[in-house]
């Protein structure tokens, strides 16, 4: 190293300061992961160099023996980890080591609770990478030179993990990055050969590159009498397998190896929920190793967030986040795909239109769905934990993936009137198996919450007849059902939309009685239409209600309350539509309504109409008018008493 130049002291981005503080306290019990994170970063840097050197071989600078080296000094209490990978320029150091260039960082930090165990999992999912060094070190130094830059354009970065860091230009002959950790006094146990070797074996055994350490108990050899022993040049040896895990036969891989490899590629602290490792030969030749995480990441609902698999071609790393191999509704899946068919100079644009990629995408999608189907069949409890984490994302599937619509539908779970809580545990196959004799439709209702759904007046006739209704209370559900028309040959029907047809569950006498009641109520229906004429499409006698006086029903193809709210929140224009007002002639309030005249009839009509709106989960357009009319009626009632 030569004399440093252009030394600057810069402040960390506010989010980095907050993350460092939280991480050091939340991850203390899992502190040994710092080595896994740093080795993973070094492995990524080697991958990137190898990829960029495909088109620019001089980046190797005459050294294509790619490796990670790990050294320690127990007296100085330091650990040094170096790689001869792509390295960083000065600007890259400031960006990568001084800021968090991730969307949603502020939102993520706001989700942290202060609970050490919970925050540890969340921070692990977010990906702490380099900053994990500060769990065990009170000072960290980084020396780095980007491949292709001159030796005197290297950078020295230093920080104690508090509010700022220093950066200066130095000379570094070899490309790549060297990180020096100055261990805290209480963490000096890590400056130990056996400890470091065991951590590399535990966490980084199956990364694609060797992690080397100095051979222990080196035989220095005998020296001539009277001469001092010469200090031998250190010999290094690989302390990991350095074989890409997915290239090994499945019967040679332990579950623990699969779990640690997942943590390496996903930067997750938790074990995966399940995985599938497959080799495909024939028309296409590729290997895939796919993982389903145990917990949803913090940015699951950000559809623009980086996603996808790590892509390798003939064992050469090509890119992270290759989203072309799985559909968006499976964006939670992590893993590796290694193809022998694609060209090494492939780009994201080429992947977009490659027929081999389309075939692989189709096969990998089927692989994930089959993996989930098997889990659902073999371990209902474990599958339920998957659904609780990722179910709402899987509900995007029927709209995106017509070919696999039925398979996705079988994986779905819903709440229903068959149960007493809001847990989504009922499959469509469960529902069909419990259908009443003569029932030919799958009935459902969408609502803002489970409680609102099960208390909806639209359910009354179904309760009376013992017909199960699915209660859909996720925001996505109404949109989902616009793309899911039938299951197992049975059509879906939203019980709050259109005409209600219970099919053969109703006998002929009931239908004839309903027609008779409708005729008798015609005078009242006409009077109601006159009052509500600008606000309703129709007024009719209900077939749904047994206990409530009235309800609102939207047209069979109109947008429901749930979907209208989503569109309103997104600032989108809503299509004009008017509901149908249904009354229950047997209800005492409706009978009383039929006896009223003039202003009192109008007031009572509007009160019933607004109550039907509220019961259906809608907001009132004129809440003050409703309160005024209701108070007026209550006052009259109290005076009459």
Swiss-Prot record:
Location of this chain's protein in the cell: Cytoplasm
Record-linked PROSITE patterns: HSP90
Keyword set, alphabetical order: ATP-binding, Chaperone, Cytoplasm, Nucleotide-binding, Stress response
Pfam families tied to this protein: HATPase_c_3, HSP90
Major localization class: cytoplasm
Family designation: Belongs to the heat shock protein 90 family.
Role this protein plays: Molecular chaperone. Has ATPase activity.
HAMAP family per UniProt: HSP90 (MF_00505)
Protein name, as recorded: Chaperone protein HtpG
Organism encoding this protein: Hahella chejuensis (strain KCTC 2396)
